[in-house]
């Protein structure tokens, strides 16, 4: 809804931005936003068919070619805490065996789906790591991703009812909302931006990701604005691409005012509830000014 204010000779308009820039495509963001939805294209583009594919890729990139059989993925499988998979040493064959649960009715439900020779010691094949990751549930994969060194990852929730809105904490209505993905920054991304990683830096990154989600939510909820500034009937300045609460937009507009314009013009902005035609509005102002000038003193 447009807003207008006049302090002669200036008139200020704050207007809806009908062609706003997508902050996930057009802004320099620290985090990457990976989402899945049947009707909406959200966040950055990606090629992951399912959330588990994304999580497996993060873990494979972190631990492949490291040839360390004591990495967190193998340690988790050895602990017996995984729901449907475990990693065990077979003394007879001298192999490490990945066993998976077929969900039948006895101990025979567990079968060997993959193995590698213990003689390789720490030279664990990457294909075996891939097999192990494929045996884990999405929840187990996410738990391991959270433990990655230097990783900051936050869930993304979408509420879809007469429009869409997004946050990182979830919504109270389970029928119209649910998790659609994550926003994350890994160790390499954080080091490139901040250098050495410390607990304070990780908290700063978390706050940055929260702010990026909030900015994207402004875009999704059409809280996108621009302004046009006129001196009498001549446009002297304009700017578009403001995202945020209207109060924040008003504060940002103050920075664009000419020196001879009273900043109070921003505080005097009023919503226009009828359709606004700027040319007609300015013409009407001019007529009113001329009428006042013609009145006998």
Description of each model-found segment:
Residues 1-297:
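Acidic interaction surfaces
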């Amino acid at each position: 809804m447009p807003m207008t204010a006049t302090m002669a000779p200036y008139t200020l308009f704050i207007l809806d931005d009908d062609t706003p820039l997508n902050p996930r495509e057009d802004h320099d963001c620290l985090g990457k936003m990976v989402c899945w939805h049947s009707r909406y294209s959200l966040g950055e583009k990606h090629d992951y068919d399912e959330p588990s594919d994304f999580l497996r890729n993060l873990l494979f990139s972190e631990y492949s070619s490291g040839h360390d059989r004591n990495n967190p993925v193998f340690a988790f499988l050895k602990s017996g805490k995984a729901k449907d998979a475990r990693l065990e040493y077979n003394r007879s064959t001298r192999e490490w065996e990945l066993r998976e649960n077929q969900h039948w009715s006895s101990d025979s439900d567990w079968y060997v789906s993959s193995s590698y020779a213990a003689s390789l010691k720490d030279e664990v094949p990457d294909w075996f790591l891939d097999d192990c990751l494929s045996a884990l549930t999405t929840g187990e994969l996410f738990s391991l991703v959270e433990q990655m060194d230097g990783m900051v990852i936050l869930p993304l929730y979408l509420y879809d009812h007469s429009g869409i809105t997004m946050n990182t904490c979830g919504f109270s209505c389970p029928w119209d909302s649910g998790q659609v993905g994550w926003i994350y920054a890994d160790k390499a991304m954080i080091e490139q931006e901040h250098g050495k990683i410390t607990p304070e830096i990780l908290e700063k990154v978390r706050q940055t990701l929260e702010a990026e989600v909030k900015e994207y939510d402004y875009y999704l909820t059409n809280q996108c604005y621009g302004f046009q500034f006129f001196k009498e009937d001549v446009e002297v300045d304009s700017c578009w691409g403001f995202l945020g609460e209207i109060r924040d937009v008003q504060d940002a507009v103050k920075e664009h005012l000419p020196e001879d314009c009273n900043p109070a013009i921003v505080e005097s902005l009023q919503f226009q509830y009828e359709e606004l035609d700027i040319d007609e509005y300015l013409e009407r102002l001019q007529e009113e000014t001329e009428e006042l000038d013609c009145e006998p003193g």
